[in-house]
């Protein structure tokens, strides 16, 4: 029998991330590189470690190999524990065949046995594809104080963007009275962040109920949460005010990387009290040549810079040759940029080779972002 845990986290990391185009052709979205040395999933795993959540089940499905290799036994996030720690939970085969996860609720339902072994009081459900720093222990305290059945973390979004999100309509006490999935005419701008805390008994009961319903799409937002509301359960909205970014598109991924270069950013990677952990790439120090010029940029280990880099994020092992300019761009691990190249407002994928004299910038709309990656 596993050691009893007060709260167990379940991290949904099986997303395809199709809006990221070629970046996720052979890679699960949570494994996409971010911020010069991280992967998207590092933020959620680091939040767990910093919040004192010591038992994390990671549910994978789409293109899982590189993500599995990256996570390993969880030692990068201090989650390699004798009891608990990180457990990767891909779909598994039964006598009737492989049981694929058909939705977010289905993924958790198929792993109820994993949760049961810990006899948790609470289950924290997370998404592995957002960029943010959050103390989950404060949300758990709120959930307990409010005597909620379910608590959902929400963030205020601009009204003109509210129709892109699952929106929570609440009363004055922040109790959720209605949940609307991407409403055309939203009545609130409190968007669900896809972070839920359930009382374990409630979660188990309603996932089993959802699984028995042949009409259900087995999704928390579309099926389980509306059912809980219909049956009068107490759902509380937990307001979050920090930095949070859904990096589900090429442009939003680029924007989040550019946010790291601001003088005043609420996503401070230098915060010693809330570190973001990652797997060390074991590269040599970066080299900046005498004639190179670097301004307002994040340059990671193993880079060789002989040209100009301005307001950009370069991952490990990137080469920028003489006469080249990289401006307002993100260059992913191992990319080689030849001589006299101009790259502006672009994301260059991992291991890409940009030939001498190439010019890459938005052609029509100057606000666009260009993606150069395998398969494009």
From Swiss-Prot:
* GO MF terms, alphabetically ordered: ATP binding; glucose-1-phosphate adenylyltransferase activity
Residues forming coiled coils: none
InterPro entries reported for this sequence: ADP-Glc_PPase, ADP_Glu_pyroP_CS, GlgC_bac, GlmU/GlgC-like_hexapep, NTP_transferase_dom, Nucleotide-diphossugar_trans, Trimer_LpxA-like_sf
Positions bound to alpha-D-glucose 1-phosphate: 101, 166, 181-182, 192
- Catalysed reactions listed for this entry: alpha-D-glucose 1-phosphate + ATP + H(+) = ADP-alpha-D-glucose + diphosphate
What GO biological process terms does the UniProt entry carry, in alphabetical order? glycogen biosynthetic process
Q: What is its EC number?
A: 2.7.7.27
Query: Can you state the subunit structure given in the record?
Result: Homotetramer.
Task performed by this protein:
Involved in the biosynthesis of ADP-glucose, a building block required for the elongation reactions to produce glycogen. Catalyzes the reaction between ATP and alpha-D-glucose 1-phosphate (G1P) to produce pyrophosphate and ADP-Glc.
Q: Which family does it belong to?
A: Belongs to the bacterial/plant glucose-1-phosphate adenylyltransferase family.
**HAMAP family in the cross-refs:** GlgC
Protein name as annotated: Glucose-1-phosphate adenylyltransferase
- Record the organism: Bacillus anthracis
């Amino acid at each position: 029998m596993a050691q009893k845990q007060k709260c167990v986290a379940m991290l949904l990391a099986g997303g395809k991330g199709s809006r990221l185009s070629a970046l996720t052709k052979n890679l699960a979205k949570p494994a996409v590189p971010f911020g010069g040395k991280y992967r998207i999933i590092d933020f959620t795993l680091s939040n767990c470690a910093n919040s004192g959540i010591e038992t994390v089940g990671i549910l994978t499905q789409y293109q899982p190999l590189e993500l599995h290799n990256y996570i390993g036994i969880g030692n990068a996030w201090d989650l390699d524990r004798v009891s608990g720690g990180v457990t990767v939970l891909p779909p598994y085969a039964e006598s009737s065949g492989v049981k694929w996860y058909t939705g977010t609720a289905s993924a958790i339902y198929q792993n109820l046995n994993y949760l049961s072994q810990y006899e948790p009081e609470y289950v924290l459900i997370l998404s592995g594809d957002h960029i943010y720093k959050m103390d989950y222990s404060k949300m758990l305290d709120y959930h307990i104080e409010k005597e909620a059945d379910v608590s959902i973390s929400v963030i205020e979004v601009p009204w003109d963007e509210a129709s892109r999100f699952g929106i929570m309509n609440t009363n004055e006490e922040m109790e959720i009275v209605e949940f609307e999935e991407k409403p055309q005419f939203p009545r609130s701008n409190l968007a669900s962040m896809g972070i839920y805390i359930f009382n374990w008994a409630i979660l188990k009961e309603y996932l089993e109920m959802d699984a028995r319903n042949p009409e259900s799409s087995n999704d928390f937002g579309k099926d389980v949460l509306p059912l809980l509301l219909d049956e009068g359960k107490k759902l509380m909205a937990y307001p979050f005010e920090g930095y949070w970014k859904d990096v589900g598109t090429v442009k939003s991924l680029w924007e989040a990387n550019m946010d790291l270069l601001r003088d005043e950013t609420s996503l401070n990677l230098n915060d010693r009290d809330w570190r973001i952990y990652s797997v060390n790439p074991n590269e040599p120090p970066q080299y900046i040549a005498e004639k190179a010029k670097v301004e307002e940029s994040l340059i990671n280990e193993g880079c060789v810079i002989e040209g100009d880099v301005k307001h950009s994020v370069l991952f490990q092992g990137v080469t920028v040759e003489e006469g080249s300019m990289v401006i307002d761009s993100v260059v992913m691990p191992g990319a080689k940029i030849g001589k006299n190249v101009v790259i502006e407002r672009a994301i260059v994928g991992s291991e890409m080779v940009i030939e001498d004299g190439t010019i890459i910038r938005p052609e029509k709309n100057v606000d666009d972002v260009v993606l150069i990656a395998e398969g494009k």
